[in-house]
């Protein structure tokens, strides 16, 4: 070896160590991984040289690699540090290597109590380690197959690093080599050979060892004494050169592999080189920097020669060929470059044979026997081999035993009786004997076997004179399998003598058989397909077995039952032997965790199992067999936690008890009843919970307690020292944070005095009475607890008596529903209270007198004769225990709870006789009162809906729409009430039914509130728009939907539907989600009703107008309006007609009657649904619900005036006071109803064209104006400004003023009077118009009608004059108001046209007209005016309906022809879509009168200012009819500003109206 090789190797190893070490947790311990070879010193391994420091080397795969170590002895290192090696399976961070002291050794011995002997020996060997300095030789060789090897400095004085020489610290005393056991490389074999060579040289004799795949050649010229086997000398072979070979010769000393640690200090010999065999080299040189990476080699390329390609790995199909090359460079020199192995694919044209393959096993067949032990089988098929492959190996049929339900006990035969006489007096005959069957009970079956026994008997031969009968043959099969059948047997007559006679008797015998009655057709259950399973036809009483559904494995059973009426029906299937695939997979995962050798890993695996089990049970979709399987999983988890050194975390404990809470939920009662037929799983669960409580309690500190709260159980665990129990124990603590409501409101209580816990006797077995719920075995020692049924292991309490008796672990559990699933007591008793469990370990000695006080509340009301009882595990008559009523005393019984006083700690409950009606099964259909009440209410409401649908076009209004929604909510509620009473609903359907029932109950209340709100808006005169109607819908349907959505979101549907009814649960406060909103709605409805009633009384109750104004609010500026403004939304007071008040009062009365009845109906419905046993609540609901339907129908249908009028007209009975041409008259029984638009047009035309005062009846005008409406299909058109500055006014008729005093003569000037302000509709709403700049206050005739043009007219000056007429000028700014008289009469006003009385030339008969107020009416003189009637040929105006005088008497047909003929009113349609177009056409007709006015205006054309002096007087007498429309652009700036409408600050405009202005509610 050259001097440069060790130097280069040391540099490479130092770099390797620098990167291979993992970051150490401290400077005193380090972990190295990925080291192939290295020689290390103290300075390399221990940066901080101190006692207890360690250096750990990792073996990447103990099954594939082995660690070889050589220790080079150095006296100073051995003296000061005493290094030793520890083989480890796991690496422990910051593990100290110091030898344990006496105290630590004792503690470690205590912690190892209970371990197997093998584990104790292994632990002792690991703790002591291997002393490296124990041998006498210079070298120590070690071989390890462990995961880790740790080098420790066990002893080191503080001054040792300063006393050691630097050479000793730098001395490489440890060499490490990692060898592949399957394929050793040349480098590793060379290192082993070098170690053997150096060992032989140092010892002075031959030294050798064997390694599979390596052999060391013999050195040339060696001493014959150093070799043990002859061989040819190898020339020019280096001592460290190694040729891979086969196994070493037997003469070599083997270095054994495995888990043993072998120490070699003796010399080793070289072996003989075997024959060279080709090997495939798969070892790449690994990098010295990163483990798992390969490093390129460098060296002489000429020394690298590839071997020939190997034979193809496969004889058929595509395989691989491999070739290798060897690196012959020195291990201490440069490394070779390039890979040592290459592969390439090789193709073979031969077809590979395909062996036969078994398919999946089929499903297991049914058990061969219906009871007892039978067998089940399954088969599989083999896919046939191909191309000469092998056939399938293994059985095709597989069988296993199966155990079904126990067979009925058969009776026992008594002894046989004596033989009877022989049947024949001569020759051969038969004898019979019989026996009796003893049946002990009615459930026993008959005896199996024959009742009689027959044998042949021999007599003397009969005389030959007569014939004789031969023997009887066997009885034939019965002719019927059921009912009475027949069996026959025959015998033959043997030949008689020549003088004899034939045989006497008959050769056939018949007897009845099969007296079992055949089931009738109605006593047979038919074939049924349920849950993906087919149940075949069976007779009543038979049990049919079937395979479980596809998502489970096992067998399901079902019994055919017989009802009280004698009709067969299928019972519920039993799935107690069905296990879901998910639960079975979880159990397999549990077995895998249990198979782990490491206890810590097994404990962590149990946490994962509990988490998975919680997720499965949270889905609530499992079979009864899954519950039993879950109990077994929890038992295994508890046992694993006990054996493992793993303390369950708080989350693990919470999940464990949450799983138990899911399992004992009341919804699983039927599943537990089904599972009890196979195994008492609820009792096993009770014991598992007690064991887990003590497991958690052992991990607690002294005086520490733990409280776990779930939906169905509350657990309290605390640990108290035996010597000083702090205080008495009271459970549960209702005031604790996070406690459930069912615990806070219950009266369950446990009082455990501390004297009971101070009576224990450590070291002595508890007396038979001291067995607690946690230690059910009575008469046993405290060290063991017998396992329950199915338990595979026994629990060993701590063996140390001081530790086991120094602390009490006290556990108390309050179960909410455990009494429903535990095995029931003997009838007629039943568990009628909650169940409470108290367990204490170590067990206490029972006191001399009862000191434990337990108070338990009832879960079933109406029970009698209560008894306190405890669960006794030692009852001999049952294998799991039973209730014992003798262990507790019943102190007092109250209406809500019972107080008990017991002597032993156990599981307590109250047993009593349930009420008789509780034993009756609830019917699957709703009760008769509920059906009657819902049916009557639905029929009444459907009648109302049918009537409204028939007359909808005549009675359509907001009130009707609200009523229809209200009826729909009540109908849906009645239907859901009937659906929710069915017991066949699933959990999801029941939850949805409860949620929708909650929604429709609230919506019915909300629609009553909506009706009250609509009444209030009608009374105050606010116009309803589409926005308001949308608010009605939001209140009626949106508010209930919001309440239900919030409730469902917060509760996650918990509480919506229970196992008894489909309604809100009475526990948990969810019922307030219905009671609270309903109460608020009733209160708000009452307040609105009071307000509406006060407003109606304040308006209709005061007769004097002045008092009414003083009593009311301040008069609004738009109160004088007789028409609504389409822009501001103001409604004038005349529109609030008496019909509005009447409708509002009717709506108010309806709310006052319907709302209380609605509240009583739903309250009785809730009581009837939640308590189905009470017939009183069901009867009350039927009465209230029926009355509610009749009242709603009567109020809104039979008593409603609109419906009555429509029905009368349909029947041909209308008002008799109307004329034949009345728009609402009926002819020949046919209804002639004019649209609202036609009525308005008719009234406007009569008022404008014929200025008859008597036709302008105020009541008629008010009634007509109250019917004004807009088209519902069109958006409202607000008042907009025209393109030229003009105003667009409402197309509806204008201001109609009723004369309040005597009308002056037509030729007399009207007396001066104060005119009402005029309002205009603009963009901003309603504004008052200033008219003082146009003229003085000159009122027109009170009968004048103001027409508002629909659209902007061409308001150009000088409309009626000649072409040369001057344009009018507006009044300049600052001109006084009286100067307005000088304004030319051709100046138009942009909004109104004044209409004078039309002169018709009626004659004297028209002169004595009286107005409605009794004043004499003088007709005006016939002067030429713009409103005069033209020539007879041009006369085509509409005549009034009733005109006094003979000259106006025309036939109805002529009047109809004359009516509106020139106005072309045939275009008037009943639809409202053409209202706008017809109004525009009507206004154009009105403005055609301007051409007649132009002639009179030309005659009286005014002169310019300064002209005739009588001009002002003439203009003073002009009326408003002389003004025409003009644009705002023609006005001066100042007058234009004065024309701007003023907005009153006392009121705010509303939104544009959309819909009718009807004030009907």
Swiss-Prot record:
**Chain spans, region Disordered:** 757-797, 1355-1377, 1417-1447, 1491-1561
Free-text disruption phenotype from the record: Deficient mice show significant resistance to depression after repeated stress in the social defeat test. Additionally, hippocampal cell proliferation in deficient mice is increased.
The source's superkingdom equals Eukaryota
Q: Cross-referenced Pfam families, in alphabetical order? A: 7tm_2, AGRB_N, GAIN, GPS, TSP_1
Which intervals lie on the Cytoplasmic side per UniProt? Answer: 952-959, 1010-1030, 1094-1115, 1169-1561
What Gene Ontology cellular component terms go with this record?
extracellular region; glutamatergic synapse; plasma membrane; synapse
Q: Where is the composition biased (Polar residues)?
A: 1519-1528
Record's compositionally biased regions (Low complexity): 760-775
User: Does the record's keyword annotation contain Cell membrane?
Assistant: yes
Tissue pattern of expression reads:
Specifically expressed in the brain. The peak level in the brain is observed 10 days after birth.
Q: Which UniProt keywords apply?
A: Cell membrane, Disulfide bond, G-protein coupled receptor, Glycoprotein, Membrane, Phosphoprotein, Proteoglycan, Receptor, Repeat, Secreted, Signal, Transducer, Transmembrane, Transmembrane helix
What is a GO molecular function of this protein? G protein-coupled receptor activity
Q: Which Gene3D superfamilies match?
A: 1.25.40.610, 2.60.220.50, GPCR, family 2, extracellular hormone receptor domain (4.10.1240.10), Rhodopsin 7-helix transmembrane proteins (1.20.1070.10), Thrombospondin type-1 (TSP1) repeat (2.20.100.10)
Does the UniProt entry include the keyword Ubl conjugation? Answer: no
Check the record and name the SMART domains matching this protein. GPS (SM00303), HormR (SM00008), TSP1 (SM00209)
Q: Which residues lie on this side of the membrane: Extracellular?
A: 21-930, 981-988, 1052-1072, 1137-1147
Membership in a protein family: Belongs to the G-protein coupled receptor 2 family. Adhesion G-protein coupled receptor (ADGR) subfamily.
Give the multimer and partner information.
Heterodimer of 2 chains generated by proteolytic processing; the large extracellular N-terminal fragment and the membrane-bound C-terminal fragment predominantly remain associated and non-covalently linked. Interacts with GABPB2. Interacts (via carboxy-terminus) with TAX1BP3. Interacts with GNAZ. Interacts with SH3GL2.
Protein's name in the database = Adhesion G protein-coupled receptor B2
Tell me what organism the protein belongs to. Mus musculus
């Amino acid at each position: 070896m050259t001097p440069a090789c060790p130097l280069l190797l040391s540099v490479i190893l130092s770099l390797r160590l620098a990167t291979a070490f993992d970051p150490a947790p401290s400077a005193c311990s380090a972990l190295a991984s990925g080291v192939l070879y290295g020689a290390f010193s103290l300075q390399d391994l221990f940066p901080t040289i101190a006692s207890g420091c360690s250096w750990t080397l990792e073996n990447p795969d103990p099954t594939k690699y082995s660690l070889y170590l050589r220790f080079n002895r150095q006296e100073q290192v051995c003296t000061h540090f005493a290094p030793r090696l520890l083989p480890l399976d796991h690496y422990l961070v910051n593990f100290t290597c110091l030898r344990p002291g006496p105290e630590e050794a004792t503690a470690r011995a205590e912690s190892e109590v209970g371990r197997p002997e093998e584990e104790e020996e292994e632990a002792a060997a690991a703790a002591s380690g291997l002393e490296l300095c124990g041998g006498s030789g210079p070298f120590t060789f070690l071989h390890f197959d462990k995961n880790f090897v740790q080098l420790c400095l066990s002893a080191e004085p503080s001054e040792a690093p300063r006393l050691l020489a630097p050479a000793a610290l730098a001395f490489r005393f440890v060499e490490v080599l990692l060898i592949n056991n399957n394929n050793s490389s040349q480098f590793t074999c060379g290192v082993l050979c070098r170690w053997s060579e150096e060992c032989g040289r140092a010892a002075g004799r031959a030294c050798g060892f064997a390694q599979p795949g390596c052999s060391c050649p013999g050195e040339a010229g060696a001493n014959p004494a150093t070799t043990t086997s002859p061989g040819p000398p190898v020339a020019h072979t280096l001592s460290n050169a190694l040729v891979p070979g086969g196994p070493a010769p037997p003469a070599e000393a083997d270095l054994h592999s495995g888990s043993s640690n072998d120490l070699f200090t003796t010399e080793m010999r070289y072996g003989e080189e075997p024959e060279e065999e080709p090997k495939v080299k798969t070892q790449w040189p690994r990098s010295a920097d990163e483990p798992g990476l390969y490093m390129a080699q460098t060296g002489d390329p000429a020394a690298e020669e590839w071997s020939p390609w190997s034979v193809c790995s496969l004889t058929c199909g595509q395989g691989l060929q491999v070739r290798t090359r060897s690196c012959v460079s020195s291990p201490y020199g440069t490394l070779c470059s390039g890979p040592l192995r290459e592969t390439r694919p090789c193709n073979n044209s031969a077809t590979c044979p395909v062996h036969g393959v078994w398919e999946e096993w089929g499903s297991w067949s049914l058990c061969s026997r219906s009871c007892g032990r039978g067998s089940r089988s399954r088969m599989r098929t083999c896919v046939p081999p191909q191309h000469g492959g092998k056939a399938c190996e293994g059985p095709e049929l597989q069988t296993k035993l199966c155990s079904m339900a126990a067979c009925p006990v058969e009776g026992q035969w008594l002894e046989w009786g004596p033989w009877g006489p022989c049947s024949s007096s001569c020759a051969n005959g038969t004898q019979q004997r019989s026996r009796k069957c003893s049946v002990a009970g009615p459930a026993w079956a008959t005896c199996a076997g024959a009742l009689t026994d027959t044998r042949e008997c021999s007599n003397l031969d009969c005389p030959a004179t007569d014939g004789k009968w031969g023997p009887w043959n066997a009885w034939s099969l019965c002719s019927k399998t059921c009912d009475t059948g027949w069996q026959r047997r025959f015998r033959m007559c043997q030949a008689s003598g020549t003088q004899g006679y034939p045989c006497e008797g008959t050769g056939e015998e018949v007897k009845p058989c099969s007296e079992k009655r055949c089931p009738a057709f109605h006593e047979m259950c038919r074939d049924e397909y349920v849950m993906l399973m087919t149940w075949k036809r069976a007779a009543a009483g038979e049990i049919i077995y079937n395979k479980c559904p596809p998502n489970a494995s096992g067998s399901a059973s079902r019994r055919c039952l017989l009802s009280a009426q004698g009709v067969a029906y299928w019972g519920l299937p039993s799935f107690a032997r069905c296990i879901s695939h998910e639960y079975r997979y979880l159990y397999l995962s549990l077995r895998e965790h249990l198979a782990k050798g490491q206890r810590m890993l097994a404990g962590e695996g149990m946490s994962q199992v509990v988490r998975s089990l919680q997720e499965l049970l949270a889905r609530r979709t499992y079979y009864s067999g899954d519950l039993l399987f879950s109990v077994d999983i929890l038992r295994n988890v508890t046992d694993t936690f006990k054996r493992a050194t793993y303390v369950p975390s708080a989350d693990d404990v919470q999940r464990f008890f949450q799983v138990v809470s899911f399992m004992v939920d009341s919804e699983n009662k039927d599943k537990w009843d089904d599972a009890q037929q196979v195994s008492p799983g609820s009792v096993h669960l009770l014991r598992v919970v007690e064991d887990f409580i003590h497991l958690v309690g052992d991990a607690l500190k002294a005086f520490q307690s733990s409280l776990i709260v779930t939906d169905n159980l509350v657990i309290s665990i605390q640990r108290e020292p035996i010597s000083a129990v702090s205080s008495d124990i009271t459970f549960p603590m209702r005031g604790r944070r996070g406690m459930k409501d069912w615990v806070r409101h219950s009266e369950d209580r446990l009082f455990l005095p501390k004297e009971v816990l101070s009576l224990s006797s450590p070291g002595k077995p508890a007396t038979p009475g001291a067995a607690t719920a946690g230690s059910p075995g009575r008469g046993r020692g405290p060290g063991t607890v017998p396992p329950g049924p199915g338990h595979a292991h026994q629990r060993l309490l701590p063996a140390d008596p001081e530790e086991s008796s120094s602390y009490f672990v006290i556990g108390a559990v309050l179960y909410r529903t455990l009494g429903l699933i535990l095995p029931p007591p003997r009838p007629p008793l039943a568990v009628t209270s909650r169940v409470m469990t108290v367990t204490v370990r170590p067990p206490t000695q029972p006191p001399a007198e009862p000191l434990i006080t337990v108070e338990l509340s009832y879960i079933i009301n109406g029970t009698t004769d209560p008894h306190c009882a405890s669960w006794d595990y030692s009852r001999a008559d049952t294998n799991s225990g039973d209730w014992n009523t003798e262990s507790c005393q019943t102190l007092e019984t109250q209406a809500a709870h019972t107080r008990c006083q017991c002597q032993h700690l156990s599981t307590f409950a109250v047993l009593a006789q349930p009420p008789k009606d509780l034993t009756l099964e609830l019917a699957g259909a709703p009760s008769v009162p509920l059906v009657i009440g819902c049916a009557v209410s639905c029929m009444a409401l459907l009648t109302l809906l049918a009537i409204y649908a028939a007359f909808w076009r005549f009675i359509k209004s907001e009130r009707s729409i609200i009523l229809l929604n209200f009826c729909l909510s009540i109908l849906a509620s009645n239907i859901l009430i009937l659906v929710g009473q069915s017991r066949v609903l699933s959990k999801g359907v029941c939850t949805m039914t409860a949620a929708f029932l909650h929604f429709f109950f609230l919506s019915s209340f909300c629609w009553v509130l909506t009706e009250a709100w609509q009444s209030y808006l009608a009374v105050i005169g606010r116009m309803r728009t589409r926005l308001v109607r949308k608010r009605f819908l939001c209140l009626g349907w949106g508010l209930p939907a919001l309440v239900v959505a919030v409730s469902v979101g917060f509760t996650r549907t918990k509480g919506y539907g229970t196992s008894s009814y489909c309604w809100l649960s009475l526990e948990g406060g969810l019922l307030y989600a219905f009671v609270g909103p309903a109460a608020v709605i009733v209160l708000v409805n009452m307040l609105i009703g009071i307000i509406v009633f006060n407003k109606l009384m304040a308006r209709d109750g005061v007769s004097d107008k002045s008092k009414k104004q003083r009593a009311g609010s301040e008069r609004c500026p738009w109160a004088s309006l007789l028409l609504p403004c389409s822009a501001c939304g103001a409604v004038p007071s005349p529109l609030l007609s008496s019909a509005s008040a009447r409708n509002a009062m009717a709506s108010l009365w309806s709310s006052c009657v319907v709302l209380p009845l609605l509240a009583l109906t739903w309250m009785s419905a809730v009581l009837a649904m939640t308590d189905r046993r009470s017939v009183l609540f069901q009867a009350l609901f039927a009465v209230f619900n029926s009355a509610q339907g009749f009242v709603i129908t009567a109020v809104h249908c039979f008593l409603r005036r609109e419906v009555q009028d429509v029905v009368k007209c349909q029947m041909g009975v209308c008002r008799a006071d109307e004329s034949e041409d009345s728009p609402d008259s009926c002819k020949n029984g046919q209804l002639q109803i004019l649209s609202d638009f036609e009525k308005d047009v008719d009234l406007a035309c009569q008022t404008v064209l014929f200025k008859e005062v008597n036709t302008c009846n105020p009541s008629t005008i008010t009634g007509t104006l109250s019917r004004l409406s807009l088209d519902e299909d069109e958006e409202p058109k607000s008042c907009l400004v025209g393109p030229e500055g003009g105003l667009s006014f409402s197309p509806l008729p204008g201001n109609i003023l009723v004369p309040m005093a005597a009308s002056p003569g037509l030729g007399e000037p009207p007396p001066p009077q104060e005119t009402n302000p005029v309002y205009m509709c603009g963009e901003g709403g309603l504004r008052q118009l200033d008219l003082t700049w146009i003229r003085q206050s000159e009122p027109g005739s009170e009968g004048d009608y103001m027409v508002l043009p629909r659209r902007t007219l061409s308001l150009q000056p000088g409309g009626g004059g000649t072409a040369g007429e001057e344009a009018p000028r507006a009044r300049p700014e600052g001109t006084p108001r009286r100067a307005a008289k000088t304004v030319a009469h051709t100046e138009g006003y942009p909004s109104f046209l004044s209409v004078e009385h039309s002169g018709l030339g009626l004659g004297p008969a028209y002169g004595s007209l009286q107005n409605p107020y009794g004043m004499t009416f003088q007709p005006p003189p016939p002067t030429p005016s713009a409103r005069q009637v033209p020539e007879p040929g041009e006369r085509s105006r509409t005549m009034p309906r009733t005109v006094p005088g003979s000259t106006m008497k025309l036939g109805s047909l002529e009047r109809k022809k004359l009516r509106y003929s020139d106005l072309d009113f045939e275009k008037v349609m009943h639809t409202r879509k053409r209202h706008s177009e017809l109004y525009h056409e009507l206004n154009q007709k009105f403005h055609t009168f301007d051409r007649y006015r132009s002639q009179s205006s030309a005659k009286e054309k005014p002169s310019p200012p300064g002209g005739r002096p009588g001009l002002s007087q003439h203009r003073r007498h002009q009326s408003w009819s002389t003004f025409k429309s003009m644009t705002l652009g023609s006005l001066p700036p100042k007058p234009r500003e004065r024309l701007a409408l003023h907005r009153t600050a006392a009121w705010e405009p509303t939104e544009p109206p959309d819909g009718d202005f009807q004030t009907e509610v």
